[in-house]
Amino acid sequence: MIARQECAATVLGGPTTVLDLGGLRIVSDPTFDDPGPHGYLTKTAGPAVTEDQLGPVDLVLVSHDNHPDNLDDRGRALALAAPLVLTTRSGAGRLGAPATGLPLWTSHTVPRPDGGELIVTAVPAVHGPEDAERDADGFVNCEVIGFILSGPGLPVVYVSGDNASIGTVAEIARRTPSIDAVVLHAGAARVPARFRNRALSLDSIRAAAAAAILGLAEIIPAHYDGWTHFSEGRDDLVRAFDDAGLTARLRLVDHGTWIPLRP
C-alpha cells in the first residue's frame, strides 16, 4: 500500500491522479484496466500503481463517465466502492450511488479527518473544439466538468478534466484567482470520426498557454500517455513549456512519483 502523504499528488498514467489533501485520499478519473482494446480506443500501458495498492479511497472525482480512457471497468469498480463520487449530473444518473452530480460552479463539502473541510467546486470543461457542433444539452462531445479543490490550510488545486478550451481556462482563472496547482489534462486526444480529427483535449502549446493564464500555479500534466489516441506526449510538453519560458512551473515526473503541494 502506498503511504498517505500530508499534501501531495501523483499521476498514475492516463488521466488518473491521486491527491492526498487534509487526510483525504482522492482519485480523479480512475483507469486501472490492463492494456488492450476498449471499444474504439486502445490502451497501451497500465497504471504505475494498481487500485489494490491505494488502500481506502475517500473520494473519487470523475470528469465524465462516457469514455473508457477516463473511467474504465476497474476504475468504475473502485469508484462505486468509495464513500463518495463527484461527477457530472448526467454521469451521476448513470453511475448511481454513491455518485453525486454537481452543476457548474456549485460546491460539495467533504469532512476531513484533520477536522477541517475540503470544498469541491465543479468548473466548466469543453471536450473538443469551441466551434464544434453541440448536443441537445449544449455540450461538445459530452458533459464534462473539472474540479477546484480547496479548504482551510490547503492549496487550491484545479483538476481540469478533458478540456480543450483556453477560454474556459481563462474563465476559471478569473473566478478562482489563487490557484496553487493544476492537474492539467493534455495529450491532444484525437479520434478520426470526431470533429474532423481535431483535438479533444489541450495540445502541448495550448497547455503552456493555459499555464500562462493560470499565473504562478504549478502544472502537473496528465492524460498524455497510455492510449493510442493521445497524439502528443511528454516530449511535446517539455518542448512547448520550454518555448513558452515556463519550464520552472512544469512538474513532469515519472508516474507514481509524489509531487508535494503547497498553499
Regions found by a protein language model. Name each.
Residues 27-34, 102-110, 117-128, 165, ...:
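Conserved catalytic scaffold of divalent metal-dependent phosphoesterases
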Residues 90-93, 164-255:
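Cap/insert and terminal regions of metallo-dependent hydrolase folds
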Residues 67, 75, 91-92, 106-107, ...:
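Alpha-helix capping/helix-boundary segments
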Residues 1-27, 31-36, 40-44, 126, ...:
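Zn-dependent metallo-beta-lactamase
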Residues 1-4, 85-155, 239-262:
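Metallo-beta-lactamase
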Residues 27-29, 56-71, 86-89, 157-163, ...:
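Active-site neighborhood of phospho(di)ester-bond hydrolases with catalytic His/Asp-centered motifs
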Residues 10, 18, 27, 58-61, ...:
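Conserved beta-strand elements of the Class I
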Residues 21-62, 66-69, 73-78, 128-137, ...:
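Pre-active-site segment of Zn-dependent metallo-hydrolases
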